[in-house]
């Protein structure tokens, strides 16, 4: 009995040790402890390779032991690792991506025609049950009728964003929505242009523009300021001023004086500092403070006074910087000569001392100047006017006209252009740009459109004209017409109106033929109604037959229905939502 009682007790720890397969911690000897400490010191100094965890990453030897040691409940094998200090993947929250957003404008189309298992017994939708249905309870549910099944509601996704995702103001933005605003502004501009064109047409029809164009004062540019046309325009401008506030929209300014739409946009053509010189060895740009102290054009050989930006060092020489530097220099010189003053310790004392020094210095210069003039003379030379005023006036007589042209006297010098002028190359007798045709510039001497081509003279003109004639004959194109004057356009418009009046007279004669067309349409509609009734009867018979015994529609005719057939279909169609549907069926 005693042996039997001891065996199971002694067997229990043995089986437990086999299952755990763990070795008991052994006590380290003094030699092992010393070797371990030496190895740690070598790793800290970099003479020995660092420990590597199970993922192949190096473990920093400077990490304390209480951080790097693995607890027994995480890894009983006690392998070197820092996995227990890192965030565990199973505890990390899963956030939605930045591109996900709620769907808008989802169309709910009733596509299903058969009741589905698990759907709502009342309406037939799959997204809810009968007790959660918002539709009016039917007398006979969709489960038993199988008709008029409601569409499935669109369930929005449950989005969970992180800190940045919740504050992303552009998440879910659709750029196509902005096109609606663009179209609205385009319609407003089009309406304004049509109003302006209509007013011009009215003035043209009344003959005001023609009289103004043919008047001799208009040809010589001597128009009276208080003319009738200007009065009319001023009155129209006053009327437009009344409604300018109604026409004004955000982003626009309706200028009634000039009759144009002015965009309230600020044109900024400034260049970023780091884009002025793309050479990486040029001036250093600090992105944190957005400062570039040195001149970016220093290596380009440009004069700092000619460039628009020469670095931020100019700030050091603006404001009170120069005066403060002069005060500091005065403090150092005064301290060397025995005066105990300091810019930071005694700023008020130093400022008063420096002001008195400047006053005494100016008085000393004046006394020195007066003593020299008394001794040597020459005061009359100092009283002369400044050099800027010596050549400011002239006695040359010049007479101008009211247009600004010189009538008599010396003509003013023409402002020089920044481009090269009167440069004739490659044997040309005219400059580049002296000839223009069909949107292209060229040389007038040879009609050549290539800038660096050699001059061919009259032979080049003849060759260009012959090529144009050959191209026109081959393509059958007519030569470009000359632009018409306003008078010619007005005459063409009157001719078109006469043609329209003649067409209206012909249309009245053909009104008698329209009665016959109505009778034919009525006959076609009657035939289409009879055909539609026959089709509905055929469909009713087929629906009463079992679904598996219905015939195939393999030889069904597919063609576009006529207008009479569509009208008959609309007249015979039954609408279940119509309250008069039961009476119409009778």
UniProtKB/Swiss-Prot annotation:
Residue positions of motif Bipartite nuclear localization signal: 129-169
This protein's encoding gene: Slu7
Annotated InterPro entries: Slu7_dom, Splicing_factor_SLU7
PANTHER family reported for this sequence: PRE-MRNA-SPLICING FACTOR SLU7, STEP II SPLICING FACTOR SLU7
Keyword Metal-binding carried by entry: yes
Covalent link location (Glycyl lysine isopeptide (Lys-Gly) (interchain with G-Cter in SUMO2)): 349, 408
Cellular localization per UniProt: Nucleus; Nucleus speckle; Cytoplasm
Span of zinc fingers (CCHC-type): 118-135
Single GO molecular function: pre-mRNA 3'-splice site binding
Subunit annotation: Component of pre-catalytic, catalytic and post-catalytic spliceosomes. Associates with the spliceosome prior to recognition of the 3'-splice site for step II, probably during catalysis of step I.
Keywords of this entry: Acetylation, Cytoplasm, Isopeptide bond, Metal-binding, mRNA processing, mRNA splicing, Nucleus, Phosphoprotein, Spliceosome, Ubl conjugation, Zinc, Zinc-finger
Acidic residues: bias regions: 235-248
UniProt free text on domains: The CCHC-type zinc finger is required to retain the protein within the nucleus and prevent its shuttle back to the cytoplasm via the CRM1 pathway.
Signal sequence bounds: none
Presence of the UniProt keyword Glycoprotein in the record: no
Residues the record lists as N-acetylserine modifications: 2
GO CC entries: catalytic step 2 spliceosome; cytoplasm; cytosol; nuclear speck; nucleus; small nuclear ribonucleoprotein complex; spliceosomal complex
Superkingdom field: Eukaryota
The name this protein goes by in its record: Pre-mRNA-splicing factor SLU7
Bias (Basic residues) ranges: 498-509
Main location: nucleus
Task performed by this protein: Required for pre-mRNA splicing as component of the spliceosome. Participates in the second catalytic step of pre-mRNA splicing, when the free hydroxyl group of exon I attacks the 3'-splice site to generate spliced mRNA and the excised lariat intron. Required for holding exon 1 properly in the spliceosome and for correct AG identification when more than one possible AG exists in 3'-splicing site region. May be involved in the activation of proximal AG. Probably also involved in alternative splicing regulation.
Start-end of Basic and acidic residues biased regions: 20-44, 519-550, 557-578
């Amino acid at each position: 009995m005693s042996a039997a009682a001891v065996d199971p007790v002694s067997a229990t720890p043995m089986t437990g040790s086999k299952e755990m397969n763990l070795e008991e911690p052994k006590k380290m000897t003094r030699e092992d402890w010393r070797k371990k400490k030496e190895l740690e010191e070598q790793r800290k100094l970099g003479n020995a390779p660092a420990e590597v965890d199970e993922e192949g990453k190096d473990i920093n030897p400077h990490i304390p032991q209480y951080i790097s040691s693995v607890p027994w409940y995480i890894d009983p094998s006690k392998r070197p690792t820092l996995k227990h200090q890192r965030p565990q993947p199973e505890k990390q929250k899963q956030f939605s991506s930045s591109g996900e957003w709620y769907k808008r404008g989802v169309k709910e189309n009733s596509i299903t025609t058969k009741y589905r298992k698990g759907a709502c017994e009342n309406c037939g939708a799959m997204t809810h049950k009968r007790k959660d249905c918002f539709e009016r309870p039917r007398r006979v549910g969709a489960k038993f009728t199988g008709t008029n099944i409601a569409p499935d509601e669109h369930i929005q996704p449950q989005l969970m964003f992180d800190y940045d995702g919740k504050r992303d103001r552009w998440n879910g933005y659709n750029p196509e929505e902005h096109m609606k605003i663009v179209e609205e502004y385009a319609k407003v501009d089009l309406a304004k242009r049509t109003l302006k064109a209509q007013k011009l047409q009215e003035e043209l029809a009344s003959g005001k523009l023609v009289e103004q164009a043919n008047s001799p004062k208009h040809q010589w540019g001597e128009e009276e300021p208080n003319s009738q046309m200007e009065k009319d325009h001023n009155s129209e401008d006053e009327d437009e001023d009344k409604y300018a506030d109604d026409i004004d929209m955000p982003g626009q300014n309706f200028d009634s004086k000039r009759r144009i739409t002015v965009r309230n946009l600020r044109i900024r053509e400034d260049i970023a500092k780091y884009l002025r010189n793309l050479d990486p060895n040029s001036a250093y740009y600090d992105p944190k403070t957005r400062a570039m102290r040195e001149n970016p054009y220093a290596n380009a050989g440009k004069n700092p006074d000619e460039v628009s930006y020469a670095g931020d060092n100019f700030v050091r020489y603006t404001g009170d910087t120069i005066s403060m530097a002069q005060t500091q220099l005065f403090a150092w010189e005064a301290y060397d000569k025995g005066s105990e003053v300091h810019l930071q310790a005694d700023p008020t004392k130093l400022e008063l001392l420096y002001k008195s020094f400047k006053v005494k210095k100016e008085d000393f210069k004046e006394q020195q100047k007066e003593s020299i003039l008394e001794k040597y003379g020459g005061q009359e030379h100092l009283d002369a006017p400044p050099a800027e005023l010596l050549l400011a006036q002239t006695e040359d007589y010049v007479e101008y006209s009211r247009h600004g042209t010189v009538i008599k006297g010396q003509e003013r010098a023409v402002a020089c252009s920044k481009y090269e002028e009167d440069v004739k190359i490659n044997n040309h007798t005219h400059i580049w740009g002296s000839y223009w045709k069909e949107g292209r510039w060229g040389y007038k001497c040879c009609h050549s459109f290539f800038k660096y081509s050699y001059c061919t003279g009259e032979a080049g003109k003849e060759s260009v004209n012959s090529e144009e004639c050959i191209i026109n004959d081959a393509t059958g194109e007519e030569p470009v017409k000359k632009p018409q004057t306003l008078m010619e356009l007005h005459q063409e418009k009157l001719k078109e109106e006469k043609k329209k009046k003649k067409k209206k007279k012909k249309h009245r004669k053909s009104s008698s033929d329209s009665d016959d067309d109505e009778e034919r349409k009525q006959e076609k509609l009657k035939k289409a109604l009879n055909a539609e009734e026959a089709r509905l009867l055929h469909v009713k018979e087929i629906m009463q037959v079992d679904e598996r015994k219905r015939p195939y529609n393999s030889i069904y005719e597919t063609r576009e229905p006529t207008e009479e057939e569509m009208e008959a279909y609309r007249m015979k169609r039954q609408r279940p939502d119509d309250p008069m549907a039961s009476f119409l069926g009778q």
